[in-house]
From Swiss-Prot:
This is Protein FAM228A. It comes from Mus musculus. Belongs to the FAM228 family. Keywords: Phosphoprotein. The keyword Amino-acid biosynthesis does not apply. The gene is Fam228a.
Amino acid sequence: MADTKTSKCDEHFSVEKLKEWPEPESVSLMELLAREDIDEAVHAVLFRENYVVKRLDTYLQHLAVFKERRKEMLHKKWVENVVQPLQQRITDKITSYRRPGKNQVKYEHCLKQTNKPTKVSSSCLFQKQQEFREAKGTSYQHGRGKTHDTQKEAKETEKGLSFTPFSLRPHCSSPRERQRASARLMQSKPGGRNRYKGASSEKPVFTLKSHLPKEEKTVSRSQLVFERQFRASRLSQDIKEAEKKGLVVGTGPQRPRSWAAADSVPRPSLVGRRVMTAEILGEHLVSLHQAARSGLQWP
């Protein structure tokens, strides 16, 4: 076997076989071609690898965005389906215990509306008087000796009268407040100050009497009742003092006569007593007006 192998090698590396081998230039050309092919293959592999890497990077970025979006959508659904209904139930449960009844709400609204002090304007107070004057016409004016226009009369009454503001509150009226209001109304009247004074030179004005509201009439009546009671008490005291001093003749108490102008029977004792009571009443009325101006209250 060894002999056969050596014989083959000798044949292969013999001089004749060596001549048949290619030249070295042709070998170098083949090497260049092989290197170019290898470079092209490597370049194609690198280009493909770069493309794969870029696509993988974009895929990973999109995957991260999709995950974040999925989390946001899940959170939104959880808030809409779980959190908001739970919060609504909790708030309804809490407010149901604190919610007042309908009667309580109506009572509170009524208290708020009634406890607000309001001022009534003069235009509202004179609206009925203007309608009454327009309905009556000129007969209403000539019956009281008036020939001027109703608009001028309304303006004069608005300037002359000063109504006190009152509040629409329940149980706000008391005897002292009524007395104070009556004193203010008597002070606001033009002919109320010198009604019982005989020595005054001013003439009473009665043009504004028809424009006064009904409340003033009731207050003036109470004031007249109070003055009559005071007059009766003063007269009884004067009679007792006159009996003690000897001004009145007789043992029994005499009945006080009227103060009318027709009573012209000369009685010296009664005249003196009347003069004294008139002076006392005048002083009392002056003190009443001063107290009404200063804001004092009489018991």
